[in-house]
Amino acid sequence: MSAGEIDRLIGLLARLPGLGPRSARRAALHLLKRRESLMDPLMEALGAVAASVRLCPVCGTLDTRAPCSICADPRRDGTLICVVRDVADLWALERGGVFSGRYHVLGGLLSAIDGVGPEDLGLDRLAARVAEGPVVEVILALPATVEGQTTAHVIADLIEPKGITVSGLAQGVPVGGELDYLDDGTLTAALRARRPV
């Protein structure tokens, strides 16, 4: 392997989230030192994933099946659709094991600055899924950012006229959180979303 190939590997690793040039160099060196036990299996796994993983045509998640294992699971509640920004958010909800409905992955958020409009997020696919039934509630699990809230309002305006309940995740003080350590936005959201005890 020439220095150019090593530099290319480092450059590609540095493009991964959370890895800068120094971390990428350390990762590349680690891989090179453990070629048989780590690099070769990693190359095989990457090749297999590249060849077999695709977007689910129904919800937009990543899976080796089409439709994905979540959409194809008859035990999932088809009356609930949870809308998430990306696959990482879906995985986070699945890790919690609390939601038993189906998902819709937007693949991003509306952003005038970045030129992302409703057509880029497949909102027409979401509207079609809701229209086909038997959906009774759409849960918006979107970030509490300007883009997330803008996206939520657009989706609510699209879905609510169809007589479907549109809800959002609760926001506020996390379990075990101390008020002194929370930012002003979180405290404001918590006060506005207060409920009877």
Curated annotation (Swiss-Prot):
Superkingdom: Bacteria
Molecular function (Gene Ontology), one example: DNA binding
Residues of the Toprim domain: 79-174
Keyword DNA repair: yes
InterPro entries: DNA_Rcmb_RecR, Rcmb_RecR, Rcmb_RecR_Znf, TOPRIM_dom, TOPRIM_RecR
Keywords: DNA damage, DNA recombination, DNA repair, Metal-binding, Zinc, Zinc-finger
TM helices/strands, residue ranges: none
GO biological process terms, semicolon-separated: DNA recombination; DNA repair
Coiled coil segments of this chain: none
Chain positions of all zinc fingers (C4-type): 56-71
SUPFAM superfamilies named among the record's database cross-references: Recombination protein RecR
Family: Belongs to the RecR family.
Function noted in UniProt: May play a role in DNA repair. It seems to be involved in an RecBC-independent recombinational process of DNA repair. It may act with RecF and RecO.
Designated name of the protein: Recombination protein RecR
UniProt organism field: Rhodospirillum rubrum (strain ATCC 11170 / ATH 1.1.1 / DSM 467 / LMG 4362 / NCIMB 8255 / S1)
